[in-house]
């Protein structure tokens, strides 16, 4: 796991510790365990990133002697399989069966978008690295906290550079056909067109396409 991702995960968990303090009545602060759920991906094409997420959380808990805000932590990890349907099932299990106080994850934007209405309904705080723009812009969720950038943010300076420095006027874009890829290209298009450019065509190869030849 990179130092950057490890630092971000530690920041998320530190925020979780603050929530642990706020959610528990003072009388039970020492006695009641803090239930921490993780929605991650351990199977399928996104598994590498999901496994790193779990390793980061486990490392943090080991370093803190399995405590957060003075409370013992009960940790629950759920494999979403990297699908919206799997994410919906697993988040319901964490909330309704395991009774978690806070959820970390999921990894992918399309997973996050699949569960945002449910999270708002059950009012369980969700801390995520997923970059779905809608969660903080078009469909803000008061129970969601992002610990990373949005999908489109990194594309804004790239589009400005292409238009202003490279003087490009017409571009064909290519990105994976899933939520993150669409939001990335949407961010690029907005800034590029604001600077006088034009997108001629958008290409959407399926996720994890091995061959990009015509």
Kindly give the residue locations of the regions a language model identified:
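Short beta->alpha junction loops
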Residues: 76-84, 202-210
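Extracytoplasmic ligand/sensor domains, especially the bilobed periplasmic-binding protein
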Residues: 100-207
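Short, well-structured alpha-helical segments in soluble
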Residues: 84-101, 161, 213-214
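N-terminal export signals
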Residues: 7-28
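Extracytoplasmic "Venus flytrap"
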Residues: 37-56, 78-84, 107-108, 175-182
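C-terminal segment of N-terminal export signals and the immediately downstream linker at the start
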Residues: 23-41
